[in-house]
């Protein structure tokens, strides 16, 4: 049943070189497995972060409830937007938002300023209508008035003029509103835009 090999030339031997090659192969396989596991973890976390950012851009928007303009000498000198959170949105800090103004004679980007409306220039300011903060939308019931000084941006808006306003929140979500001045401003103090 068992065969005894007595001749030295016919016995199989494992040399030290073969043992070293085997250990090296095991080490290389272990290192490769570690690299694959680390790469998979990195890709998973990167994909998760990208998904969260995309979700924030879609859901953390504002809604423009209404818009009106103050009329002075048959021209609109202030454009006022009433804004609120969109459904499912987190807190939206309007001080970190921008408004792209594309008007009849000029296009620019407005940033937040706490200055009084008459000294805004290429900025906008906010006032609380309903809620505890004048510049952060916390609840769906909060309402904030966004004030832009038209003559600080370009010239006052005349009858029939149109301005495209795109509000970009700190999350990168955008809301666009077209403010259309009525054809007649005679004997008016304020108009719906």
Swiss-Prot record:
Keyword presence, Glycoprotein: yes
GO cellular component: archaeal-type flagellum
Biological process (GO), any one: archaeal or bacterial-type flagellum-dependent cell motility
Chief location category: other
Keyword annotations of the record: Archaeal flagellum, Glycoprotein
Propeptide part(s) removed at maturation, as residue ranges: 1-12
One MF annotation (Gene Ontology) recorded for this entry: structural molecule activity
Keyword Glycoprotein: yes
PTM section of the record: Glycosylated.
InterPro entries in alphabetical order: Flagellin/pilin_N_arc, Flagellin_arc
Cellular compartments annotated: Archaeal flagellum
PANTHER family in the cross-refs: FLAGELLIN B1
Role played: Flagellin is the subunit protein which polymerizes to form the filaments of archaeal flagella.
Family label: Belongs to the archaeal flagellin family.
Name of this chain's protein: Flagellin B1
Organism: Halobacterium salinarum (strain ATCC 700922 / JCM 11081 / NRC-1) (Halobacterium halobium)
Gene: flaB1
């Amino acid at each position: 049943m068992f065969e005894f090999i007595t001749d030295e030339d016919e016995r199989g031997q494992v040399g030290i070189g073969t043992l070293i090659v085997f250990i090296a192969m095991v080490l290389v396989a272990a290192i490769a497995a570690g690299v694959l596991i680390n790469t998979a973890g990195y890709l998973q976390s990167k994909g998760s972060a990208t998904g969260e950012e995309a979700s924030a851009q879609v859901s953390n928007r504002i809604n423009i409830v209404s818009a009106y303009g103050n009329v002075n000498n048959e021209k609109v000198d202030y454009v006022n937007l009433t804004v609120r959170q969109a459904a499912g949105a987190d807190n939206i800090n309007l001080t970190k938002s921008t408004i792209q103004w594309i008007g009849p004679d000029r296009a620019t980007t407005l940033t937040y300023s706490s200055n009084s409306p008459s000294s805004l220039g290429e900025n906008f300011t906010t006032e609380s209508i309903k809620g505890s903060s004048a510049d952060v939308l916390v609840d769906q019931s909060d309402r904030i008035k966004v004030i832009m000084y038209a003559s600080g941006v370009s010239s006052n808006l005349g009858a029939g003029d149109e301005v495209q306003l795109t509000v970009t929140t700190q999350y990168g979500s955008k809301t666009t509103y077209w403010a259309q001045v009525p054809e007649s401003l005679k004997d008016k103090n304020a108009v719906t835009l």
